[in-house]
Amino acid sequence: MKPSLVLKMGQQLTMTPQLQQAIRLLQLSTLDLQQEIQEALESNPMLERQEDGEDFDNSDPMADNAENKPAAEVQDNSFQESTVSADNLEDGEWSERIPNELPVDTAWEDIYQTSASSLPSNDDDEWDFTTRTSAGESLQSHLLWQLNLAPMSDTDRLIAVTLIDSINGQGYLEDTLEEICAGFDPELDIELDEVEAVLHRIQQFEPAGVGARNLGECLLLQLRQLPATTPWMTEAKRLVTDFIDLLGSRDYSQLMRRMKIKEDELRQVIELVQSLNPRPGSQIESSEPEYVVPDVIVRKDSDRWLVELNQEAIPRLRVNPQYAGFVRRADTSADNTFMRNQLQEARWFIKSLQSRNETLMKVATQIVEHQRGFLDHGDEAMKPLVLHDIAEAVGMHESTISRVTTQKYMHTPRGIYELKYFFSSHVSTSEGGECSSTAIRAIIKKLVAAENQKKPLSDSKIAGLLEAQGIQVARRTVAKYRESLGIAPSSERKRLM
């Protein structure tokens, strides 16, 4: 084939750096956005914070934003949004025209409580390990701190350090004593009984139950630290030592027969065991709390739901008018070119923030419009909602809705929820309507809470009760919803009354 030159006309979509920035800011959480803003303030001298009460004579493109507009009202079938407008700082021949809109579319918890065991004492000066522990401290460091306060020989201290290294985050000894003993230098001539003796000393450390080799020993160690006058102490020790498997399987009739106690007595023994902590190490190695900052605040005024941005979450920015005034339009020096580029970047950054706020406001308002039943009555009134519904309502692509609802939170009178929480699939009803999966989960939770604990509801029975309410759900679907709620099967929910 003979080579030739051909002239064609075509269109190609190019994602500009400004568009990439707008998309990136849109998908950031509030905490990440605050960090992004701080980095922008540090790197761009043209950007600065706008303090409350300051008047910049329209020098700030964000001065006339949603903060100064009334909150969006959601009532009946109509709603109004707060709009955001921005004025350019100055119009120069060298500056690019900024568009008005940025196209951004592209099984133990059921038996035992996890709280720490309560050790009553009449001595007000008794040392309390909880007063010393701090967030982020590991269980090993806490045990080593106590080890340094205990008088021991050098050999015993070496054994103790090795044992502490073998204790996992839950407080249990992971390796057997034989394996630990075999790991020492033969020249030290350390015997198995020495290792076990040091382990018994570590088991006296706080938190109570640490260093146990199994669940029964963990509970027994905690029982031994309770006052001897504690009611049902003897029976509780026997229960965790000899019949822990029967307790786990909830074979209460077998427990009463083998322990030779009545049902009421067994219930009191189990209540004592339930006050213990099966994971003593979790008292120290608790995960750091995750903080969220709501992006949107929803409140009710009479019969109307009002939607507004959380203005305290994101600082207001403006272009520094003094630095902007130094930019000379005709000057082509390197310094002036740098300042001109920084000014343009500052304007685009502010514009991207403005676009993010507008999109977030539109989406949040539509969510509240669709889920007013939830706000008024709770989870059982949640309606089916998918991304396409909101995308169609606000005239945006589903990918944009997905970005703006990820890691964005709404503060409501019922609590703080991620925007994605309000989206759920639907299940058909016998009357031809639809019910959201969130509402079904709420109904299942309500049914289980009201069940007879001596005869808990099976998944099939729950499916039958839902069908009686006109909701057609298979037993396997009920099991899936139940597991997502952290509810154990009926065989594990059986209780002694």
UniProtKB/Swiss-Prot annotation:
- GO terms for biological process? DNA-templated transcription initiation; positive regulation of DNA-templated transcription
Q: Gene3D superfamilies this protein is in?
A: Homeodomain-like, RNA polymerase sigma-54 factor, core-binding domain
Specify whether rRNA processing is a keyword of the entry: no
Which superkingdom heads the taxonomic lineage of this protein's source?
A: Bacteria
| Renumbered residue ranges of the record's region Disordered | 41-101
Q: List the disulfide bonds.
A: none
Q: Where is this motif: RPON box?
A: 474-482
InterPro entries given for it?
Answer: RNA_pol_sigma_54, RNA_pol_sigma_54_core-bd, RNA_pol_sigma_54_DNA-bd, RpoN_core-bd_sf
- Give residue spans, biased composition: Polar residues: 75-86
Which UniProt keywords are listed?
Answer: DNA-binding, DNA-directed RNA polymerase, Nucleotidyltransferase, Sigma factor, Transcription, Transcription regulation, Transferase
Q: Which GO terms describe its cellular component?
A: DNA-directed RNA polymerase complex; protein-DNA complex
GO MF entries: DNA-binding transcription activator activity; identical protein binding; nucleotidyltransferase activity; sigma factor activity; transcription cis-regulatory region binding
- Look up keyword Signal and say if it applies: no
Q: Which residues, as ranges, make up the DNA-binding region of this protein?
A: 386-405
What's this protein's family per the entry? Answer: Belongs to the sigma-54 factor family.
Q: What job does the chain carry out?
A: Sigma factors are initiation factors that promote the attachment of RNA polymerase to specific initiation sites and are then released. This sigma factor is responsible for the expression of the xylCAB operon and the xylS gene. The open complex (sigma-54 and core RNA polymerase) serves as the receptor for receipt of the melting signal from the remotely bound activator protein XylR for the expression of the xylCAB operon and xylS.
Q: Can you name this protein?
A: RNA polymerase sigma-54 factor
Which organism's genome codes for this protein? Answer: Pseudomonas putida (strain ATCC 47054 / DSM 6125 / CFBP 8728 / NCIMB 11950 / KT2440)
